[in-house]
Regions:
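Phosphate/diphosphate ligand-binding glycine-rich loop within oxidoreductases
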Residues: 2-72
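Glycine/Thr-rich phosphate-binding loops of Rossmann-like dinucleotide-binding domains
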Residues: 10-12, 31, 102-103, 153, ...
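Phosphate-coordination loops involved in phosphoryl transfer and adenosine-cofactor binding
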Residues: 38, 88-92, 168
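Glycine-rich NAD(P)-binding loop of Rossmann-like domains
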Residues: 70-103
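Gly/Ala-rich phosphate-binding loop of Rossmann-like dinucleotide-binding domains
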Residues: 105, 109, 189
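NAD(P)-binding Rossmann-fold cofactor-contacting core
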Residues: 110-126
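Rossmann-like adenosine-cofactor binding region
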Residues: 121-197
């Protein structure tokens, strides 16, 4: 069965001889909680999707690292010469180290960004769990969120966790919006604790 979250087919109970369900959409949050799904769930992994995400993540990390917005949005039309630190001096944390997070981390490391990876589950070489999340957030000049939306990740970045970020940190969220508590994020932006999101 090829699955779409907007399809009328949401009850898999009658399909006892089905070998599997293929999800072709970004995100699996709607189907993973489906109690009638007993068949194996497959998801599409396309190198082009990964490449596109890596380009987005690297592009936006460089945009903020180099301070491009101050040059693009310059109402005074005055050239403000600034010298950003080297990439090796701007730590990036990636929450979610699946295929997209791992590929993004590799590309950022190739540019000499120090990258900390965090995963909800224990994986070799990565931070994990609540203590690991606190450590990962505390060093993130740039935070990239690439986690799926699940009950465990919804509002993962609440006021307490946003407060762990260094002052002026940038949050890039190409993943799911529900990972961040919107009210807490707006308060952190208004207070100047988060520099950009």
């Amino acid at each position: 069965i090829i699955y779409s979250p907007i399809s009328p087919l949401q009850d898999f109970t009658p399909y006892t001889r089905t070998k599997g369900v293929l999800n072709l959409w970004a995100g699996v949050e709607k189907i993973v909680g489906n109690q009638t799904l007993t068949q194996p769930l497959c998801r599409m992994v396309d190198p082009g999707l990964t490449e596109g995400m890596v380009e987005w993540v690297v592009g936006h990390c460089l945009r903020h690292h180099l301070g491009m917005d101050s040059h693009i949005v310059n109402p005074d039309h005055v050239w403000n010469q600034t010298c950003p630190p080297l990439a090796r001096e701007r730590p990036v944390t990636i929450l979610g180290m699946g295929a997209l997070g791992s590929a993004s981390a590799a590309a950022l490391r190739a540019l000499n960004f120090p990258v900390t990876g965090w995963s909800r589950t224990e994986k070799p070489g990565l931070l994990h769990g609540d203590a690991g999340l606190a450590r990962a957030l505390s060093s993130a000049a740039i935070l990239v969120t690439l986690l799926p939306k699940t009950p465990e990740t919804e509002n993962l970045l609440n006021a307490d966790r946003l407060a762990l970020l260094p002052k002026g940190a940038v949050i890039l969220n190409p993943g799911r919006g529900a990972l961040i508590d919107d009210e807490a994020l707006l308060a952190a932006l208004d207070a100047g604790h988060v520099g950009h999101a």
